[in-house]
Amino acid sequence: MDERLLSGESAYEDADLEYSLRPQTLRQYIGQDKAKHNLEVFIEAAKMREETLDHVLLYGPPGLGKTTLANIIANEMGVNVRTTSGPAIERPGDLAAVLTSLQPGDVLFIDEIHRLHRSIEEVLYPAMEDFCLDIVIGKGPSARSVRLDLPPFTLVGATTRAGALSAPLRDRFGVLSRLEYYTVDQLSAIVERTAEVFEVEIDSLAALEIARRARGTPRIANRLLRRVRDFAQVRGNGTVTMEITQMALELLQVDKLGLDHIDHKLLLGIIEKFRGGPVGLETVSATIGEESHTIEDVYEPYLLQIGFLQRTPRGRIVTPLAYEHFGMEMPKV
């Protein structure tokens, strides 16, 4: 798979930047008004009762701020956060080590929680429900189970694939929050805030232009701003203007709707070789040289969201909107 400027997944270079840009409170957090309002109520209620917050599941596309929200929850509750991920917890002992290190009220954040092995989930169930841990000591006939009490804690799980969670695990979360794609105005505010942190001057129209092409995703908006800033410093006077922004994004092959060369390859492949579809996923995969699960999980969601692609029982179909975007006429039936 090509390294994508427009991927919502976190890249290595994003990590330090995202940490420095991360808001510390719900008040500072831009967007996700519904999830934010609900969390404000649940956090305030837990603090009034002097209890830990119910376990929270944050789900939605990558790059929308799930990790940021997990840190904000801990900050608002006045506790520490321990961060790990589904793939990093390989054995029940790994999970036990993390759980036994928690202090009362702490937040345990597990990113990509859908990738936990089922055997590890089973260790997690009593920990979430009863704040205890069942450990098997020894092997064979002499093996015995020992129950350890854990301090009350809040598990915050994050996933891009809520449907991949097992029902028993999903049902143990008291708070489920779906994060939605951001509006252009919200992203523009995020771009201007990031530019302020960078100490870069930016025109409001340039911030809007970056926001329009950021696919509803703050991580992509910040990444595009970094690249446009480079052009502003080398090709301009350091100010991110509309002219510099349009030039930079054109050279980066990011079109006015936030589509890149891979999106173009996928859509035009279906249009030119299969008259717009319907065509099966495996055939599309062979045509553009990408794995089918990558097409389904990475490339298609945004195209479906903006109405350029349809999934039907007979296969993928390119819509009239996509033809219009490319200035092409739909084939006559």
Swiss-Prot record:
Residues 183-253 are annotated as: Small ATPAse domain (RuvB-S). The RuvA-RuvB-RuvC complex processes Holliday junction (HJ) DNA during genetic recombination and DNA repair, while the RuvA-RuvB complex plays an important role in the rescue of blocked DNA replication forks via replication fork reversal (RFR). RuvA specifically binds to HJ cruciform DNA, conferring on it an open structure. The RuvB hexamer acts as an ATP-dependent pump, pulling dsDNA into and through the RuvAB complex. RuvB forms 2 homohexamers on either side of HJ DNA bound by 1 or 2 RuvA tetramers; 4 subunits per hexamer contact DNA at a time. ATP binds at L21, R22, G63, K66, T67, T68, E129, D130, F131, R172, Y182, R219. Mg(2+) binds at T67. DNA binds at R311, R316. Homohexamer. Forms an RuvA(8)-RuvB(12)-Holliday junction (HJ) complex. HJ DNA is sandwiched between 2 RuvA tetramers; dsDNA enters through RuvA and exits via RuvB. An RuvB hexamer assembles on each DNA strand where it exits the tetramer. Each RuvB hexamer is contacted by two RuvA subunits (via domain III) on 2 adjacent RuvB subunits; this complex drives branch migration. In the full resolvosome a probable DNA-RuvA(4)-RuvB(12)-RuvC(2) complex forms which resolves the HJ. It comes from the Bacteria. Residues 256-333 are annotated as: Head domain (RuvB-H). It holds the Pfam family RuvB_N. This is Holliday junction branch migration complex subunit RuvB. Residues 1-182 are annotated as: Large ATPase domain (RuvB-L). The keyword Nucleotide-binding applies. The keyword Cytoplasm applies.
